[in-house]
């Protein structure tokens, strides 16, 4: 079915768009042209205190080789050592699987092609891949040697990660509509009704959510396990929730007065037959995402910046209600 095909290809498509990426490498081919054409910024000194706590290298080559070795080994502790405490959030998005995939992408691009460019006598950057994608964290020369300047790359890395994660969240919202249509094509509980799934994860032994484990030869469930695990409210322990490319997701079973048709409960006689909606919010505001998104079966996705208290604000959203402050995603 068309819906199953799109659902099954969601994860690789999302990975191509933006894998909650450390060092912004998953989308190297997308951003290379713009980044390469941007004028080089003037060298900015790393603070003496920060430089003193960072490992230094005799040459830029040695520094970048140490980085690649850490990424190749998936050595998170070594990455933390190279970039220091201030750079820790730059290499950890909160989604370990996506981070590891991004590190592997970096290494593959590096192995295919790489070059070091001297932006000044005391500043060097690494470009990788056939598109010569520039790594946003340069090496700068200090009294002790060459060190990674995480301050220089901070804003750029976070901006790229957020941009990709938000594109992912939008794509998930659109795929969610197909998943629910797929789900509703079959009577999943034997009550004679075609209903939407009221939750992401099915109860053990049931098909009352978008995801359930399957055996070899069985048709896949509409959603994959990683997306299903991205709902902290429905899991027994919040620590078990894993953001899906930097975002959490929750199904909504009502709509408010600002939705088409006005306020209504999608449940009729306890059965979810009148519609369904989805809410997506960043796991870490300003680190994994900025915008919160919501969509319904009408096919429209809306976005809004809920601010620093996004998690608390999202927890209060119980209905699809794109009122003032919510903008349609084009």
Where are these regions (language model features)?
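N-terminal secretory signal peptides that target proteins for export/translocation
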Residues: 1-13
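Surface-exposed, charged secondary-structure patches
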Residues: 87-135, 238-245, 249-258, 263-272
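Short beta-strand edge/turn micro-motifs at domain boundaries
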Residues: 124-127, 131-167, 171-174, 300-305
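Flexible, glycine-rich surface segments
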Residues: 183-287
């Amino acid at each position: 079915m068309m819906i199953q095909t799109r659902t099954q290809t969601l994860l690789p498509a999302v990975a191509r768009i933006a894998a909650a990426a450390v060092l912004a490498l998953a989308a190297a081919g997308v951003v290379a042209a713009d980044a390469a054409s941007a004028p080089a910024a003037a060298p900015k000194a790393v603070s003496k205190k920060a430089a003193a706590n960072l490992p230094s290298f005799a040459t830029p080559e040695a520094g970048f080789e140490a980085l690649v070795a850490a990424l190749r080994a998936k050595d998170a502790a070594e990455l933390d050592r190279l970039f220091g405490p201030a750079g820790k959030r730059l290499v950890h998005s909160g989604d370990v699987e996506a981070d590891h995939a991004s590190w592997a992408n970096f290494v593959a691009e590096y192995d295919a092609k790489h070059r070091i460019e001297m932006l000044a006598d005391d500043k060097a950057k690494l470009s990788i891949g056939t598109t010569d994608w520039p790594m946003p964290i340069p090496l700068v020369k200090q009294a002790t040697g060459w060190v990674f300047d995480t301050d220089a790359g901070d804003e750029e890395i976070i901006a790229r990660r957020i941009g990709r994660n938000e594109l992912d969240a939008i794509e998930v919202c659109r795929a969610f509509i197909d998943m629910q249509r797929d789900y509703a094509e079959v009577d999943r509980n034997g009550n004679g009704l075609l209903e939407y799934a009221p939750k992401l994860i099915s109860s053990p032994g049931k098909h009352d959510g978008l995801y359930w484990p399957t055996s070899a030869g069985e048709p896949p469930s509409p959603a994959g396990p990683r997306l299903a695990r991205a709902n902290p409210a429905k899991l027994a322990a919040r620590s078990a929730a894993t953001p899906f490319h930097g975002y959490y997701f929750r199904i909504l079973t009502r709509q408010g007065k600002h939705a088409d048709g006005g306020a209504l409960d999608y449940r009729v006689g306890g059965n979810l037959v009148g519609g369904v909606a989805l809410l997506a919010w960043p796991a870490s505001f300003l680190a994994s995402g900025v915008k919160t998104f919501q969509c319904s079966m009408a096919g429209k996705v809306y976005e809004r910046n809920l601010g620093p208290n996004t998690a608390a604000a999202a927890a209060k959203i119980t209905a699809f209600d794109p009122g003032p402050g919510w903008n349609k995603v084009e």
